[in-house]
Each structure stands twice: as structure tokens, then as C-alpha cells.
């Protein structure tokens, strides 16, 4: 099978090479294409049998998926609409609420309160943003601040108004997301497959980058197992509600009483040491095995 891996200059070496090497072991012909170099015309001419989009590329927001749908070229991962929804936390939660209402069930996961601010608003209303966030975000400081730049950036945790202002100023050209921070165990849950046939892999503790310890969840094995099952159920329901396909990574927080949803990655990193790769390894799977299985479906 002729497979095209779509990547940009920033993730070409790591993400794209990981995917190419994995698929080549399945005896596929794999070529990496730069999405910044007339990618639509190139794909229209080459007509690969399948495309795979490297994490961190424009596929995070569904742009590349929509182009592939237009060209009628199959691709791994979720469709453009699901990617757009999962990239926006507020729309994700709205979709999840609609799903729960339609299924006549109770909401299994509680969202973290978050707000997005444009670069223009930060530049002109910085003090007001700080005041309103202090009034509206439950629990007060700390907050999480993340740039809205196209490339993925680290999240900054701010402890007071001064640090908050500094973090906002650093995002004056990009805009930012400000999110409630809660004490708890932060986990990344990898999900493989589509719909009701999807499988949830062991939750990964983000602090340790290792399988979450039952002892960290509760001193009682029975209670800890129940909490882990609830975390896995929440991840499964999020993917089902958002219509995610093939693979996803759901970031959750167990705050000691309930599961809170932080964000969803429809296009997770497959690189060695990533949460998705660690989850696969924990479950006895390999990235090459997972990708080649999905390609053959």
C-alpha cells in the first residue's frame, strides 16, 4: 500500500519519521510530504492509497482532514468535524452534554472551567481579564495558561495576579486559554478503535509518565479499581460522544471525588516516550503494530 505521511517542518523529523518507520515494517511504501509545499496539488497528482497525519500539524483542528475528504483520499484518525470539536474545549463539553441528554444518562465527567482570550483582547484589556478571571474561575489561583499558537506549547501554571499578568503578556501575539487548576492526579488515557468497538488502554500518570498507581488513587484496592474503571469509562464516553475514530488521547484529572476533563487530542503523538506510546507499551502493544493494524482495517 502506498501511504503518505503529512507533516510540517517542525514535526518532520520526530513524529513523521516515527510513523514512516512503523509503517515500513508492515511492508508499505511510505513517503513524507510537507504540508507547506503545495500539498493539495501534490496529493491530487500522487493519489496515495492512504494518508496519516503527524501530530502537531494542522490536522489538530481538522484542516488537513477536510482537504483529504475533499480529495476523497482515505486517512487514519478522526474526521474533520470531530477534530474541530475536540480542539475546542467548550464545544467538546457541549457535544458531550448533548450526547448524555440523548442517551438519557448522567454526565460522567465534569469539565474544568476555561476561557479563551484573543491577542487583541489581551493587548487592550489585560487588567480586566485578570479581574474577571479572579471572579469567575472557581477555587482561585493557581490557573493554567496556554498559548493559542498553532504549534503545541507548554502550559504555564500561575500562582498569583503578577504571574498571571506575565503569562498573559507572553501571549499578546497569539491569544491564550486560561483554565481552572484543581488538585488531583492527572492522567492521559489512550483509546484505540472506533465507536462501541473502541478499547481503552491503561491510564498513564502524567507526572510519572507511567501507568497510574492504584495506591495513588486510594488506599483500598477495591476503591482504587473502581476509580480506575470510572476514569476509563469517562475516556470511552468522551470519544464516543465526539465521534473520534481509530485513536485518541483523553486528558483527565481525578480530583479525589470525581473525574474532570482537561482536553482531548484527536491526533496524539506516537513518538517514543509520549503518553500514547507508553500506554500502548503498558498494554503489550507497539506503535508499529497499532498503526499497521489500523491500516489493514
Region spans (language model):
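ATP-binding N-terminal substructure of ATP-dependent carboxylate-amine bond-forming enzymes
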Residues: 1-95, 117-127
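Residue-level detector of structured alpha->beta connecting loops
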Residues: 47, 72, 172-175, 243
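Helix N-cap/coil-helix junction residues
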Residues: 73, 102, 107, 244-245, ...
Amino acid at each position: 500500500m502506498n501511504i503518505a505521511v503529512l507533516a510540517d517542518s517542525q514535526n518532520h523529523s520526530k513524529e513523521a519519521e516515527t510513523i514512516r518507520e512503523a509503517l515500513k515494517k508492515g511492508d508499505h511504501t511510505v513517503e513524507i510530504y510537507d504540508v507547506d509545499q503545495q500539498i493539495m496539488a501534490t496529493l491530487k497528482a500522487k493519489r496515495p492509497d492512504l494518508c496519516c497525519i503527524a501530530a502537531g500539524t494542522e490536522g489538530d483542528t481538522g484542516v488537513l482532514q477536510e482537504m483529504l475528504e475533499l480529495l476523497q483520499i482515505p486517512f487514519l484518525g478522526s474526521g474533520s468535524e470531530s477534530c474541530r470539536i475536540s480542539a475546542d474545549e467548550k464545544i467538546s463539553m457541549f457535544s458531550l452534554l448533548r450526547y448524555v441528554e440523548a442517551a438519557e444518562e448522567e454526565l460522567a465527567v465534569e469539565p474544568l472551567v476555561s476561557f479563551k482570550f484573543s491577542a487583541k483582547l489581551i493587548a487592550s484589556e489585560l487588567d480586566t481579564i485578570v479581574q474577571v478571571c479572579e471572579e469567575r474561575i472557581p477555587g482561585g489561583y493557581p490557573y493554567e495558561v496556554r498559548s493559542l499558537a498553532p504549534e503545541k506549547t507548554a502550559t504555564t501554571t500561575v500562582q498569583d495576579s503578577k504571574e498571571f499578568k506575565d503569562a498573559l503578556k507572553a501571549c499578546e501575539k497569539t491569544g491564550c486559554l486560561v483554565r481552572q487548576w484543581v488538585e488531583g492526579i492527572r492522567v492521559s488515557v489512550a483509546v484505540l478503535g472506533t465507536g462501541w468497538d473502541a478499547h481503552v488502554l491503561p491510564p498513564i500518570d502524567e507526572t510519572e509518565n507511567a501507568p497510574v498507581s492504584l495506591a495513588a488513587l486510594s488506599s483500598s484496592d477495591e476503591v482504587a479499581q473502581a476509580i480506575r474503571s470510572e476514569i476509563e469509562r469517562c475516556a470511552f464516553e468522551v470519544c464516543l460522544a465526539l465521534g473520534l475514530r481509530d485513536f485518541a488521547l483523553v486528558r483527565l484529572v481525578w480530583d479525589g471525588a470525581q473525574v474532570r476533563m482537561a482536553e482531548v487530542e484527536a491526533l496524539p503523538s506516537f513518538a517514543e516516550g509520549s503518553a500514547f506510546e507508553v500506554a500502548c507499551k503498558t498494554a503489550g502493544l507497539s506503535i508499529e503494530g497499532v498503526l499497521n493494524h489500523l491500516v489493514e482495517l
